[in-house]
């Protein structure tokens, strides 16, 4: 069982709003501590059989044991590693939200990268329904986002002990909620060298109140007034727009969709402006799931930043 901690973030964000962002730096300790956890010398893990795919990769399913302070549940991973032995540049894939969404949604992209010498870790994240208040937790998705960041950090801890991963060259790819979690991860963890954000939200606590984007409006209309206020207050400290400045010096690439039914253009623009250099962006003629052009572009960008070419 994960504990609820996100409400403690709000007072610290006053400092964040006043911080000098002229120079690249990670989030200050008083903010980063809310994504902390008990680190162990080793991360206990159980691996399955290796599925070798000719001319491609070795695929292995792993489970990381919960950590001692119960801030992280068991973490399920899929590792897709090049056939050649040695430490490889590594991509950490963080999937979007959705009842049927799994880490396997990135398998084909990861296999293609493995053929080029890049290893991948696909993480099963703790959110299924978009913007969903779980049980009696008023924080709802806020707790799930924080838990996803902790899971990603523990995954990197484990990867550092493995022979197939070069932890000095790590890129994070996140889609929707995965992009939200990826932004927070890059803001606090210096191990992230590159960050690719697919259809990321920018300031959901603000834009969800006024947007006419179809999916966002339907979601807003499903709340009563009291629930809505509680929900917005819980996610506000985690708005990516507040944190993206701390991703630097990691390279950041934004993949936006012109037909995004959650996030409108002004929210995309504000998020991009809040990021520090080095950064780049591309708008794709697609819905928020993006298209084949975006997939090809991801592969090119990841190879460029991880191989330095």
What do the predicted segments below correspond to?
Residues 137-176:
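Gly/Ser-rich "nucleophile elbow"/oxyanion-hole loop immediately N-terminal to the catalytic nucleophile
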Residues 264-272:
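Short alpha-helix in the alpha/beta-hydrolase fold that links the catalytic acid
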Residues 76-77, 87-96:
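Short beta-strand element of the alpha/beta-hydrolase
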Residues 247-248, 253-256:
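Short beta-strand/loop motif that positions the catalytic acidic residue
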Residues 39-85:
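N-terminal cap/lid segment of alpha/beta-hydrolase-fold proteins
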Residues 183-229, 247:
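Hydrolase active-site cap/lid region
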């Amino acid at each position: 069982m994960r504990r609820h901690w996100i409400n403690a973030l709000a007072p610290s964000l006053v400092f964040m709003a006043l911080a000098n962002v002229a120079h690249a730096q990670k989030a200050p300790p008083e903010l980063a501590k809310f994504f902390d956890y008990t680190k162990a010398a080793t991360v206990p893990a159980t691996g399955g059989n290796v599925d070798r795919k000719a001319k491609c990769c070795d695929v292995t399913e792993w489970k990381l044991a919960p950590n001692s302070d119960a801030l992280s549940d068991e973490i399920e991973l899929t590792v897709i590693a090049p056939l050649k032995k040695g430490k490889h540049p590594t991509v950490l894939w963080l999937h979007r939200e959705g009842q049927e969404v799994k880490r396997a949604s990135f398998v084909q992209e990861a296999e293609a990268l493995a053929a080029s010498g890049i290893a991948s870790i696909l993480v099963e994240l703790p959110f299924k329904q978009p913007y969903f208040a779980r049980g009696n937790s008023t924080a709802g998705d806020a707790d799930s986002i924080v838990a996803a960041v902790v899971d990603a950090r523990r995954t990197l801890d484990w990867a550092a002990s493995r022979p197939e991963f070069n932890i000095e060259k790590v890129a994070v790819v996140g889609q929707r909620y995965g992009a939200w979690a990826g932004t927070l991860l890059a803001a606090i963890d210096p191990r992230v060298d590159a960050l690719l954000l697919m259809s990321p939200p920018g300031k959901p606590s603000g834009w969800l109140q006024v947007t006419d984007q179809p999916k966002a409006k339907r979601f807003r209309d499903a709340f009563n007034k009291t629930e809505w206020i509680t929900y917005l207050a819980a996610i506000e400290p985690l708005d990516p727009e507040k944190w993206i400045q701390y991703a630097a010096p990691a390279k950041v690439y934004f993949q936006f969709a012109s037909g995004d039914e959650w996030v409108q253009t002004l929210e995309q623009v504000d998020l991009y402006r809040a990021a520090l250099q080095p950064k780049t962006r591309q708008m794709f003629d697609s819905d928020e799931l993006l298209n084949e052009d975006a997939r090809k572009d991801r592969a090119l960008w990841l190879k460029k930043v991880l191989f330095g070419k």
